[in-house]
């Protein structure tokens, strides 16, 4: 999980989001089967996302804005020297004080490639690629959230 946590600089967010976001649920992930392949499970992604949102000053137990996360697809190679993984994750941010109006509904695709130089064992390269793709997806979400402008009467993404 710790390898999926966003550890970059603090971003700027709309003041309405500051310490005002809750994470309702994370679904769609799969548990790793030690006899088969590495996967991204709901708990690991949820933990990394919570840690990332907390570090950015966004997460709150009683936040007005609620984030639901659905892991739509995780594209993984079966074998190879370079392991490229792409996560497709849907994020739905709703305003619970406004009849659960949808503030943002985005599906983000993010890729990460782990090479032979990162790890000799294919199983470890796949795990690193999964974690890297998860982290890239969380980073892209934070970028979307930092572009979000919330006005009580109007909600939009800055261009």
For each feature predicted by the language model, list its residue ranges.
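A structural "domain/chain start" motif
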Residues: 1-43, 47, 146-159
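C-terminal/domain-edge helix-coil "capping" segments
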Residues: 1-6, 52-57, 101-104, 110-159
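Sparse, context-dependent recognition of short Cys/His-centered cofactor- or disulfide-binding micro-motifs
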Residues: 6-8, 30, 50-54, 72, ...
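Solvent-exposed, well-ordered amphipathic alpha-helical segments
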Residues: 7-10, 14-21, 46, 50, ...
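Residue-identity detector for threonine
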Residues: 15, 24, 32, 37, ...
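Second-shell loop/turn segments in exported
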Residues: 32-40, 79, 120-131
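Mid-chain, structured segments of secreted extracytoplasmic proteins
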Residues: 35-64, 69
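Surface-exposed short loop/turn segments
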Residues: 56-105, 111-124
